[in-house]
């Protein structure tokens, strides 16, 4: 049995069923691209083409495969929001009614572009759910908060009656973001800068004067949890958690509408997982910056394929850990392998050992149930 070809057949069928309404050739090329990324561990077209040809998934020349992938990125008929909306409609239904946490971040791509990104926290993984590619040096056609609001709406429509909390770092925290969350009945957990101001409540009484957080949190070991008013110009009544743990370079100055305490600090720490996701996307993992893409629309289509690949490798890595196989690929005394690398290595190992088709069907990231599609973190 040619395990790679069987996996390709199974994956192609799943994408076809998952994205009903999208042109058949577009779905096939997208599935082809995603599988190549997962097997290659790279988003660089040349490397993806090499692996697809080496494994017999395509009999075309490597250069022909590379041109096919490049045409996909340049194809204006592939409307990324339309494809992704269909995807979210299928997979987010599984998460309805649960308590969910999302991370908002902004990351540069080379020197010319920026990616506004929202990811769903699932255990130790951040799964991409919404993004926008914007110019880094020229004026945006939309305002920053219009973009964030649009991305939130792309998610909210699929999650009725669901508790959603948005986590964001200092560069994005402010009253506009709080208002976007409140308008959608989302909770917020934001980190503020030391220059931001507040008036705290002590035993029910409000401080008389405004103070910068930098005037309050002066040294490691300081902790304060309670209610306060923040931002002198656009004042907000909220809960504040001020923590400067020993051994840390900076304090965490957090606001939340769900209380103040160590719980909020622990929840904010989950945001760090998005850093690992972007490290995986860049030089230490998928290496998207080596793709030399300069046009926003081309990067948008590359991210469409890449983010599907991230969902897939997250599923594979979780299954590897669940089955107690992590030590086969990683050190026991410390964790050197990222989720991306662990998931890919586990898939390659399965392909080497596979003797029947059923074992390869389990590798796919989504399961079709009576109630719809379900994202499986393990198999």
Which residue stretches match the model-derived regions?
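Single, function-defining residue in the core of a domain
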Residues: 1-44, 50-51, 84-85, 98-100, ...
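Low-complexity, highly charged intrinsically disordered N-terminal segments
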Residues: 37-73
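Active-site-proximal, Lys/Arg-enriched surface segment
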Residues: 62, 66-125, 130
